[in-house]
Amino acid sequence: MYPFSFQNPTRIEFGLDKEKEMGKYMHEYGAKKALIIYGSERIKQSGLFEDVAKSLREHGIEYIECGGVKSNPTISKVREAVAMAKAFGADSVLSIGGGSCLDSAKAIAAGACYDGDTWDFFKGTPVQKALMIFDVITLAATGSEMNWGSVITNEETQQKYSIHNNHLFPKVSVINPKLQATVSRDYLVY
């Protein structure tokens, strides 16, 4: 037998319509101002965005939004969102989407608490502080909803690096299996 250590401080809220309670969960952690990060406009067309946003409003949480995260998230999108979070005075980042959105959220959360360039973290500068991170995961993938890692691509330098830090664990991850029901079986299983 090999000795090991295991730590996972992320709270998982699993079940149908759990995303409609995100405001309650965020309120429990003291969130007041959130940057919502997401990928495509499909989350608005499906009603998912409004379900989550309504919950935030019901719990007095102000928010701004930043959409357009792509697969293999980029530092340019992260920098854009960091500037928005700082200007807004965000205390939290809420990801609605898959692993790329959540990786972006983690980098944004760290960058919003840092005076330098967020890419510094991917070059070795340790994360000292981060905004609170929350997520509604819409695609099972790499386990980003329960880990401390973020992978970001620098499109200028053609580099793709990761960071790992205890400040980057999400506080609460919502998993509603219904949100993943339309994903192909092969994608979900493999």
Predicted regions: what is each one?
Residues D51-V52, V82, C101-D115, M146-N147:
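Short Gly/Thr/Asp-enriched flexible loops that form oxyanion-binding sites at enzyme active sites
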Residues K44-Q45, P73, S104, S144, ...:
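Secondary-structure boundary/capping motif
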Residues R11, K33-L35, Y63-I64, D91-L94, ...:
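Structural motif
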Residues G89-I108, T138-S144:
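Glycine/serine-rich anion-binding loops at beta->alpha junctions
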Residues K20, C113-Y190:
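A glycine/threonine-rich phosphate-anchoring loop and its flanking beta-alpha core
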Residues M1-S92:
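ATP/NTP phosphate-donor binding region
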